[in-house]
């Protein structure tokens, strides 16, 4: 079964006719550059599920405007960022402004994963109520470990009281240490 359709698209006022109401206005400037007869893909906006933006904290390397321009140029309108930025995304009151600036300056819809534990240290839960109020779509400890499984259990229970989704990597530092395992004969040796 094919997931592509080979068809012509009629562009009117810089927007495809059949999709005029479905496309966000942020892509209108991109569609203005289409040339008649060019072979291009017409896709819904793409989603980057783990983008590493440089703002907040490292604006000397990239701003929301420059990162947004790069994302839009490649078809990405929705960008999800993990909490392990500098500073860590654990303050709900700052998140709304960050999302608004990403849309205004960069033309992208920013979706934020807040910090699951305070400072991403894996010791105690962060203020998940404040993060939800600030507009986080979920919480995560990024790739940082939890102190132990009890901390993980408590943070999962706390996040559940607010209906927050949790993204985490299954790693128990007391078991894994610096080791790795592979499936197969060597792992069971």
Where are the regions a protein language model picked out?
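Active-site-adjacent beta->alpha loops and helix N-cap segments on the catalytic face
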Residues: 88-98, 145-158
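Short, acidic/polar
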Residues: 60-68, 120-130
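Short acidic, glycine/serine/threonine-rich loops at helix termini
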Residues: 91-93, 122-127, 151-153, 176-182
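Active-site gating loops and adjacent loop-to-helix segments of metal-dependent hydrolytic enzymes
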Residues: 45, 74-78, 97-109, 173-189
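N-terminal metal-binding scaffold of metallo-dependent hydrolase/deaminase domains
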Residues: 1-37, 42
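Metal-associated gating/positioning segment near the N- to mid-region
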Residues: 37-102
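Functional cores that coordinate and move charged inorganic groups
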Residues: 136, 152-187
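Divalent metal-dependent hydrolysis catalytic cores, especially in the metallo-beta-lactamase
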Residues: 66-90, 106-118, 132-147, 163-171
